């Protein structure tokens, strides 16, 4: 079977018309192996020129559909909605509107789909160049925070996976919910030898509240950031050792040196944009993660969680609630 027989693509977009158009140009370039795949453009109610560009491509290519949300549901909810569009092809790829593609490694992706690999990682900027660590699930999870890194295969997106994905929209990474469930059931991740997609940083607004009245977005969603969201998702791994290793990989960047995820991102953005503000952001986030969040994560996993879920604590809490309820009933009767 060919790529277009195996793969459906959903492109999520919101108010990035110039980058969106560049993305479409790459997808429909003469050397693009996915130019004949079914492509759904999932527009999160854009107010710029995005709808006009999408309609133009839909009129030029019969394999392109343009869907516009009735409301701006938020970027993460739009990701979950894109996951829900899985089918009828066995493989599903959700991509963004501002990234860069190199198609040289695509033959390996097609071979992996033909073999029936369940989960394929096509991004590798945060992975070791070679060796067994390249396909280590702990390392892959932090790479897969970058949405287009993931191609979902048969049986990965299920009813429960979709429920969990929607439940995790506030935690930034709803697309990791099916991955975590796959790993919980003993699944593996196939990592291709040469990455296909890299993040394209254009210096535009990448906040999770774009298009919303930011002061009215509920606190849980407004204040969640990368490390917290990642800790929430990896906290759902049944393998506690893998959970800890995954979080450690994000914080310390074990495969790319102590500089880690934030250091590499800072250098990348610094080189592309030349903004000194990124330095301050990197210093603040690295200090917070290394000195505060990771120790708290360890305390939670090794002490607080076992304590709060113990039978003794549960029974003590139940007795206390029974006593308080009894007092409340007496007051009502008197």
Language-model features and meaning:
Residues 42-52, 71:
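A conserved acidic beta->alpha catalytic loop
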């Amino acid at each position: 079977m060919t790529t277009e027989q195996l793969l459906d693509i959903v492109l999520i977009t919101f108010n990035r018309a110039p980058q969106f158009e560049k993305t479409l140009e790459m997808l429909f370039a003469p050397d693009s192996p996915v130019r004949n795949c079914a492509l759904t453009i999932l527009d999160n109610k854009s107010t710029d020129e995005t709808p006009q560009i999408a309609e133009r491509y839909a009129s030029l290519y019969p394999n392109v559909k343009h869907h516009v949300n009735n409301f701006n549901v938020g970027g993460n909810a739009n990701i979950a909605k894109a996951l829900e569009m899985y089918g009828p092809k066995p493989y599903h790829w959700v991509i963004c509107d501002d990234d860069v593609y190199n198609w040289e490694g695509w033959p390996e992706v097609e071979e992996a789909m033909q073999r029936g690999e369940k989960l394929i990682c096509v991004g590798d900027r945060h992975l070791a160049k070679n060796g067994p660590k390249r396909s280590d699930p702990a390392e892959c999870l932090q790479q897969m925070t970058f949405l287009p890194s993931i191609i979902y295969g048969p049986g990965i997106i299920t009813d429960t996976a979709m429920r969990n994905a929607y439940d995790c929209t506030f935690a930034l990474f709803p697309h990791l919910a099916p991955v975590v469930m796959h790993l919980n059931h003993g699944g593996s991740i196939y990592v291709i030898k040469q990455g296909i997609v890299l993040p394209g940083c254009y210096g535009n607004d990448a906040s999770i509240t774009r298009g919303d009245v930011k002061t009215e977005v509920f606190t849980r969603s407004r204040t969640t950031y990368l490390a917290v969201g990642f800790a929430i998702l990896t906290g759902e791994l049944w393998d506690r050792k893998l959970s800890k290793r995954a979080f450690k990989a994000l914080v310390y960047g074990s495969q790319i040196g102590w500089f880690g995820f934030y250091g590499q991102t800072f250098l990348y953005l610094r080189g592309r944009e030349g903004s000194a503000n990124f330095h301050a952001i990197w210093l603040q986030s690295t200090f917070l993660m290394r000195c505060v969040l990771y120790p708290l994560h360890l305390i939670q996993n090794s002490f607080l969680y076992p304590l709060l879920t113990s039978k003794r604590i549960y029974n003590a809490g139940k007795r206390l609630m029974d006593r308080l309820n009894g007092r409340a009933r007496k007051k009502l009767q008197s």
